[in-house]
Amino acid sequence: MRAEIENYVKKIEQSLELLWRSLDVEASTERLNALEELTADPSLWNDQANAQKLLREKSNLEEKLNAFNKLKSNLKDALELEEMAEAENDLETLSQIEQDLKNLSIIAAKFETECLFSGEADGNNCFLEINAGAGGTESHDWASIMMRMYLRFAERLGFKTEIINMINGEEAGIKSCTIRIIGKRAYGWFKTETGVHRLVRISPFNAAGKRMTSFASSWVYPEIDDNIAITIEDKDLRIDTFRASGAGGQHVNTTDSAVRITHIPTGTVTQCQSDRSQHKNKAQAMKMLQAKLYELEMQKRTDSVNEQNAAKTDNSWGHQIRSYVLQPYHMVKDLRTDYETSDTKGVLDGDLEEFVSAHLAMNVGGKK
């Protein structure tokens, strides 16, 4: 067996072993069989809320077990084909098998990470806010680099994106933006990215070529679906309209189509100017508000609201989650997990999967 092929096979087998334990395949299969019996009973629908809950559990188990079995079957097929190709010295087929196994190892690693998702909203779409820290043009440029990094990360995962709101910097970059990320498990993949990001580089805006430090923050919160109830009273809202202009609206409005909603009790603010329709912008801003309030409630339940609020509002040294050093050496380091890589170009081009996996694995392991 070729060394490259053997390497990919070992990676996939390791993933399968971890997935077997993580999924508890035998117990999950028994539970799925029990759910199939329960959901086949017509009387189940006498309690629609419970019926929907059981159907969601059944669908989730089916998806995970089917993916596991397909992964296992694809590896078996590839190994059988590899054995025949080796016997016939079929170099073209061996090359194709190597590529297929490489792709399979990527799928296995992604599936392995997704099996660590355990939150109520992990399967939902999400919103990502980026805000430049103090420092003017330097931080504005860093915020725009972060926006591109996350758009590329979403693209790598097969998610769609919509820029809901964006405010440009005076000279370069952006002051802030809100991105809607659309796809199954989007929140699960992005939720660990909330916090402050620090960049060290030679400034492209300084004629003396000085090394500069910039900060920008990101905050991720899930889009709320019908399965999660968030009650918002009209008396608690202040709704303002204004004219959309520049990036985010992609045009200059002559009417007040942009909408800003303030939740008075919490001071939470959302705004949207991505559509020409004030009605659609209001609906999107309300959806974002529901999502933010849900995230705040989840933070309270886990007794981490103070830490999380500080992480998303205070762009300072004390609340960093990750540092990106481009000078005098190249290194991106997650300060929560200590995971690091010298491939700064890859990271800024959206290669964040290992950072997410490391953080999720740390949480499962109970580390702080």
From Swiss-Prot:
PTM description: Methylated by PrmC. Methylation increases the termination efficiency of RF2.
GO MF term (any one): translation release factor activity, codon specific
Sites bearing N5-methylglutamine, chain numbering: Q250
Domain of life: Bacteria
Main location: cytoplasm
Record-linked SMART domains: PCRF (SM00937)
Task of the protein: Peptide chain release factor 2 directs the termination of translation in response to the peptide chain termination codons UGA and UAA.
PANTHER family recorded: CLASS I PEPTIDE CHAIN RELEASE FACTOR, PEPTIDE CHAIN RELEASE FACTOR 2
Name of the featured protein: Peptide chain release factor 2
